[in-house]
Amino acid sequence: MSDQKKYLVTGANRGLGLEFTKQILNGNHIVYAACRNIDDIDELQLLSKKYQENLIVVKLDINNHDSIVDLNDHLEDVAIDVMINNAGTIGPLPYFENTYKQHFGTIDYDVWSDVFKTNLFGPVKMAETFLEQIKKGHDKKMIFISSVVGSIADDHQKAFAYATSKT
């Protein structure tokens, strides 16, 4: 199919990433579904039965620059039309019991560092590393998932590290 596009979706095994993957596959496109934990891909395995030719599950730890480079090497000959940087974290779970670690006065800098590593530095490294494959694609798009929680006007969630990393 000449208008079949190739997508790279991070955090593809659950949440928004899984839904993006489903919607893209429904459009008869190819998805490289990147996820950190290859053992936690039950829903992707179900999808792969229906979309055998179009769904390729690949390992990626967005926090690990070597993992990003390894994936780039693995997909070296793939012209990527659209990369969706979706992988992210809100911080330690259980979320509501741990938001104080993101508050001024009780900041846990390791939490902030982990959140920024996943939500900011990882996606920037993805963009830098996959730029050439995206330039080879037809659409040439990079999409970065933000959040309304990143809005200064809407600070009711109190996940300040997450909000700052998603602004």
Question: Where in this protein do the model-derived segments appear?
Answer:
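Conserved glycine-rich Rossmann-like NAD(P)H-binding loop of the short-chain dehydrogenase/reductase
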Residues: G27-D42
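The beta1-alpha1 cofactor-binding region of Rossmann-like NAD(H)/NADP(H)-dependent oxidoreductases
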Residues: V58-D70
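Catalytic loop of short-chain dehydrogenase/reductase
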Residues: T89-F116, V124, K135-T167
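NAD(P)H cofactor-binding loop motif with strongest signal on the N-terminal glycine-rich segment
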Residues: L8, A12, F160
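Hydrophobic positions on the long internal alpha-helix
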Residues: I84, M126-F130, I134
